Regions:
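Short glycine-rich, Thr/Ser-proximal phosphate-binding strand/loop in the N-terminal lobe
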Residues: 2-49, 91, 155-183
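Glycine-rich phosphate-binding loop plus the immediately following alpha-helix
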Residues: 18, 99-123, 155-195
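Glycine-rich phosphate-binding loop and adjoining helix at the ATP-binding site
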Residues: 44-52, 62, 71-130, 176
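Short beta-strand scaffold segments in enzyme catalytic cores
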Residues: 18-22, 69, 146-152
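Short, well-ordered amphipathic alpha-helical segments that serve as non-catalytic structural scaffolds
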Residues: 45-58, 191-197
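Short glycine-aspartate micro-motif
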Residues: 8-12, 62-64, 137-141, 147
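Proline-aspartate-enriched helix->loop->beta-strand connector
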Residues: 60, 196-205
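Hydrophobic, well-structured mid-protein blocks that either form specific transmembrane helices
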Residues: 117, 123-159
Length: 205
């Protein structure tokens, strides 16, 4: 297979839905977007199985997965909303948090599928796709919750899972900047987004 013909499976594992499509090496979309609801609570085994089935059904030769939690050196540090009983806004399951901690999902999925798989934080993955490659860049993702990535001259820098961090009014950033808050009161949501960006810029800019 020529490099230009290679099909890469791109997976965006979000708090409420899992989206995937085949793309070329150059980023051209090659297939319709597939979408399914995110299972909750979600164990590491469920995560691996869902991605494995998708790889098998597409015949992709490589896979990139955006993970909705904090990762360090390829291992899971924080689970985001995956270890919650029913998704965002529901209680965490401590035992499931521990089962996630330290998992090398790239290695596990590569072993399960027989193809090269890379799993990184979803905001970091977005940054790699849209970063300009120079200066200090702050990339913020907004959806069900929020994520943050920092790049300096095109290189990813360590960044926390800001979605779980508390806000001054007693919420966390996932709650304050997520889609539910936007749908409830967009004026307040816009103000909250502006204040969050100003705060993060003062820290990372």
């Amino acid at each position: 297979m020529m490099e230009g013909d290679e099909q890469i499976l791109a997976v965006d594992w979000g708090a409420t839905s899992v989206k995937s499509a085949l793309v070329s090496v150059g980023g051209r979309v090659l297939s319709p977007l597939k979408r399914r609801r995110t299972p909750h609570p979600c164990s590491p085994e469920t995560f691996v199985e869902v991605v494995r089935r998708r790889v098998e059904s597409t015949g992709a030769s490589r896979v990139g997965v955006g993970f909705p939690g904090e990762m360090r050196e390829g291992r899971v540090v924080g689970t985001g909303n995956l270890a919650r009983v029913g998704g965002p806004g529901t209680p965490l399951i401590p035992e499931l948090v521990e089962r996630w901690r330290g998992r090398d999902l790239s290695r596990e999925l590569s072993a399960e599928t027989g193809v090269e798989v890379r799993v990184i934080n979803d905001a970091a993955l977005a940054a790699l796709g849209c970063g300009g490659g120079y200066g200090v860049e702050l990339i913020v993702t907004l959806g069900t919750g929020c994520g943050l990535a920092v790049m300096v001259n095109g290189e990813l820098q360590p960044a926390p899972d800001v979605g779980t961090h508390p806000t001054p009014d007693g919420r966390n950033f996932d709650e304050a900047l997520g889609e539910r808050s936007r749908a409830k009161d967009e004026v307040r949501w816009r103000d909250d987004v502006r204040r969050a960006l100003e705060g993060w810029r003062s820290v990372y800019g």
